[in-house]
Amino acid sequence: SAGAVVGAVPSALLGAHTGIDAPLFAGACAAVAVALSPSVGWLLVTLAALAWVGAAGDPGTALVLAAALAPVPVLLAARPWLWSAPALGPLLGALGVAACAPVFAARLGARAPARAALGALSYWWLAVAEALSGRRLLLGAPAGVTGRASWQGSLPAAFQHALEPLCSDGRLLTAGVWALAAMLLPWLVRGPSLRWQAVGAAAWAVAMVAAQAALGGRFDLPRQPAPVAVGALAAALALVSANLRVRAHRRPNVA
């Protein structure tokens, strides 16, 4: 459930800042909160985690996390069970296949607005994760983002040295590319045969890689790692996902 899943995210943060058994605490909070509703559980656990991080002496970190989490209930208001799904962005980035995130966004979001929102949020969470960790998951943090040690203890410093560079750099337009890719994917792989579906998936992947390359050239961004290989993997996953969806729709109902 959404409350239980989100409990794992703040618990890792809590464990990094306190000596208390944060996973146990977060899990207990999530279990109680999710009994009320997934949306209430997600909000309560998230607010508790942010308050805990701030009280532990890292208000700047709490602010950056809040900026990552705040758009989720707004853009996915009708689908609280997807509120933790943007974590797929940084997770796939850690595996070196971040550009596959729109495939999962398209698969999880039933309708076009939800698919677009999930695609955009997946990149936003990845960008915030790069700023927090200092690791390159796709493009890396903008040059204006300094090490977390320089801003984690100050709200103004976090805004100036983390959030402002994140939002003023052209790489944030990647969120729009992912949103569009996730929204269009199911429509492009609806061909009458596997061959047409494969053509649609390949065209979709080529267009996405080309759009990201165009952004890189326009804003002088770092080159994405192995774009052709990751694009091919994304096309394959898109094709598999399309066929799984078709089979699920054709499955007869058994009483």
Go through the PLM ranges and name each one.
Residues G3-A8, F25-V34, G93, A105, ...:
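Alpha-helical transmembrane segments in multi-pass membrane proteins
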Residues L44-A48, L65-L69, L82-L88, A106-G109, ...:
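A cytosolic-side transmembrane-helix exit/cap motif
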Residues L91-A235:
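Generic multipass alpha-helical transmembrane bundles of integral membrane proteins
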Residues S1-G57, A66-V74:
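Core alpha-helical transmembrane segments of integral membrane proteins
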Residues H17-A26, S39-L43, D58-L65, W81-A85, ...:
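Short, aromatic-rich membrane-interface segments at the entry and exit
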